[in-house]
A protein has these predicted regions:
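ATP-binding/phosphotransfer module of carbohydrate and carboxylate kinases, centering on a glycine-rich
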Residues: 1-70, 74-121, 125-147, 258-408
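Glycine-rich phosphate-binding loop of actin/hexokinase-like ATP-binding domains
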Residues: 217-276
Length: 408
């Protein structure tokens, strides 16, 4: 497996730059494999034993690696093991929804060390958004036994997207308090660390690309269905955000089978959302005569119905629910794959993953009937707080590039 090098200063090919490249390769190997001996690092990098020893001594002196334990159970003397120093830097992520802000802090190895969830006040609140952000972050930082100043970088995930041309949040009218034109400046003044913002579904795609079903794939679409219906587009290995950040806002897409929704951003909905969003599942179940529909939030009701339907016999109302829902999903997805022709489509969010392989198979079959491209469909692997996991992965990637750069 290849290991990307950090950006380095200086002239390419100089000993300083080559040492920095070797350092980064070794650090990436330690992140991937866990504790390694000098001999093992030498074999994985192709470096001689003396060079590997110098490298580890250099990284240990810089505080980037720690000596930890020894190998046991092998012939010969026990070998010293080395690992990345987990406390060398920390990164944080936030997942913002209308209901709550979820925050987490991870050490540089990716291990989550602090977590906090803050209920988000309703539209009529005296608590400014900046205070909501700092309160959520402080809760996670405190749980990790750290302070704000210990966090190297923060990534904030929200519905919609901040338009890079105006600095204002778009496509998320249901997120109260986040639409001020000065919000980003206010956050920058309140936070001691650099921060970035990203669309929540884009962060799920990043999590799947780094940790889950889209590893080793550079062209894929992630379809998300939970509180809202959206997509993330990864083209040539990079997220495609569009001119205003709105690429992938497919919930607004007009589709057959539902009335046209006009002024979609004011309505905060569109044809595909109305046809196949999670809120449509309980309604469809009632139309099919399915009883015992769960009460409570529609996301939870939809997930429970889909899980029940996937476990039901192949015939009957539950199977008709899955078949009809699969057709609706494929109707909108066909437009996406016809334009983008991706290698892979990842299904994520409880409005999709709860149907498991049964729903995936039905959507795959329907899509093959409706679109010329035939990408492979898979169910996403990152199920636990995927937006937050993506935010942490994004923050960690930049943090590692900065902290692991030994050329400076």
């Amino acid at each position: 497996m290849s290991h990307p090098m950090a950006g380095t200063a200086g002239t390419p090919g100089t000993p300083r730059v080559l040492r920095a490249m070797n350092d980064r390769t070794a650090l990436d190997l330690l992140l991937e494999h866990g504790p390694l001996s000098r001999t093992r690092i030498g074999k994985l990098t192709g470096l001689s034993k003396p060079t590997a020893s110098q490298l580890l001594a250099r990284l240990e002196a810089a505080g980037l690696v720690l000596a930890t334990g020894t190998t046991e159970g092998r012939p010969g003397p026990n070998a010293q093991l080395y690992e990345v120093n987990p406390s060398v830097a920390h990164a944080a992520g936030l997942d913002v929804t209308p209901q709550r802000i979820r925050a987490a802090v991870a050490d540089i190895t990716g291990r989550t060390v602090g977590h906090h969830e803050l209920p988000t006040p309703g539209r009529r609140t005296a608590v400014p958004v900046v205070q909501q952000v700092t309160d959520a972050l402080d809760g996670a930082v405190k749980a990790a036994g750290l302070s704000r100043s210990d966090v190297h970088r923060l990534v904030i995930g929200t519905p919609g997207a901040f338009d890079p041309n105006t600095g204002r949040l778009r496509y998320a009218s249901h997120l109260p308090g986040w639409h001020s034109p000065t919000l980003l400046d206010e956050l920058a003044a309140a936070l001691p660390m650099p921060f970035e913002y990203e669309n929540d579904v884009n962060l799920v795609a990043l999590a799947e690309q780094r940790l889950g079903a889209a590893r080793d794939h550079s062209d894929f679409v992630l379809l998300w269905n939970q509180e809202g219906l959206g997509a993330a587009l990864v083209l040539g290995g990079r997220l495609h955000r569009g001119w205003t950040g709105g690429a992938g806002e497919v919930g607004f897409l007009p589709v057959p089978g539902t009335p046209l929704v006009r002024q979609v951003t004011k309505a905060n909905s569109g044809g595909f959302q109305e046809l196949a969003g999670s809120q449509a599942v309980p309604r469809l179940a009632r139309e099919l005569g399915i009883g015992n529909i769960p009460q409570g939030p529609y996301t939870e009701a939809a997930a429970a119905l889909l899980e029940r339907a996937a476990a039901a016999p192949d015939e009957g109302s539950h199977r008709r629910l899955l078949q009809t829902y699969a057709t609706r999903l494929a109707t909108g997805l066909a437009s996406l794959v016809s334009v983008l022709d991706p290698e892979l489509v990842v299904l994520s969010g409880t409005g999709l993953t709860s149907g498991g392989e049964v729903l995936r198979t039905l959507v795959q079959s329907e899509l093959e009937e409706l679109a010329a491209p035939r990408p492979r469909l898979v169910v996403g692997d990152v199920r636990e707080h995927p937006v937050l996991r993506g935010a942490l992965e994004s923050a960690l990637a930049t943090t590692r590039d900065e902290v692991f750069d030994t050329s400076r």
